[in-house]
């Protein structure tokens, strides 16, 4: 006698720790393509929601793909809830977004989650651009972050250029960087970690990161590795979140995450690889 297949609706949903909402590439190590392996290294289950799906990053001679259609994107988010997968989610992680409409949709979706789970972590890397390239996201993204997403963030990881874009304040010195970061603390926001903070002030061969909270500001310093693959910010954000979920204080989590990125950069340089090679076991 053939047994009937169990009704999926009667089975327990897959427990999800992290909803990671960012880019996805077929080839390369950026967005969720690098974040998911990092999260998995911490033993975390991830629902990876793509914002754009690309063959590779735009710095290659050819690229295919684009932003996920908005109705698909909203459907991905809605169906996570419909499957009952969000009950135990510990953090929502945001990276590269495909445009302001996605930011607005995300704002509504996250606000609904936070209304039910006021303690839910929302970690946002407000991807806008950098000092070398300028703005490389869709027009209107700065305003979209300000209007729809920053009020929901518990933590932010802008680089110095993005901090300046979001606040409209100078960030040339470390003091200015810390002051600008503090203007983003309010409401839900507990910390801002500024990567590539005040680069004009760095000693030769060093890189600085500012970790800013309501009560404290620490400047971390690490070696500069002479290679520049894409995806280091995405890797840092995932590693940071992993260490925070493991119970580390924010400054220590940032230090450990930076160390993981440095190890990956050193491995990448030694291999002569054009894409980021993930480092070894977690520390």
UniProtKB/Swiss-Prot annotation:
Top-level EC class as recorded in UniProt: transferase
The protein's annotated pathway: Cofactor metabolism; pyridoxal 5'-phosphate salvage; pyridoxal 5'-phosphate from pyridoxal: step 1/1; Cofactor metabolism; pyridoxal 5'-phosphate salvage; pyridoxine 5'-phosphate from pyridoxine: step 1/1; Cofactor metabolism; pyridoxal 5'-phosphate salvage; pyridoxamine 5'-phosphate from pyridoxamine: step 1/1
InterPro entries noted in UniProt: PdxK (IPR023479), PM/HMP-P_kinase-1 (IPR013749), PyrdxlKinase (IPR004625), Ribokinase-like (IPR029056)
Coiled-coil residues: none
Keyword Kinase part of the UniProt annotation: yes
Binding site for substrate: 23, 59, 234
UniProt keyword Magnesium, yes or no: yes
Catalytic activity: pyridoxal + ATP = pyridoxal 5'-phosphate + ADP + H(+); pyridoxine + ATP = pyridoxine 5'-phosphate + ADP + H(+); pyridoxamine + ATP = pyridoxamine 5'-phosphate + ADP + H(+)
Keywords from the named record: ATP-binding, Kinase, Magnesium, Metal-binding, Nucleotide-binding, Transferase, Zinc
Residues annotated as transmembrane: none
Function in brief: B6-vitamer kinase involved in the salvage pathway of pyridoxal 5'-phosphate (PLP). Catalyzes the phosphorylation of pyridoxine (PN), pyridoxal (PL), and pyridoxamine (PM), forming their respective 5'-phosphorylated esters, i.e. PNP, PLP and PMP.
NCBIfam families attached to this UniProt entry: PRK08176.1
PANTHER family on file: PYRIDOXAL KINASE, PYRIDOXINE_PYRIDOXAL_PYRIDOXAMINE KINASE
Listed name of the protein: Pyridoxine/pyridoxal/pyridoxamine kinase
Organism name: Bordetella parapertussis (strain 12822 / ATCC BAA-587 / NCTC 13253)
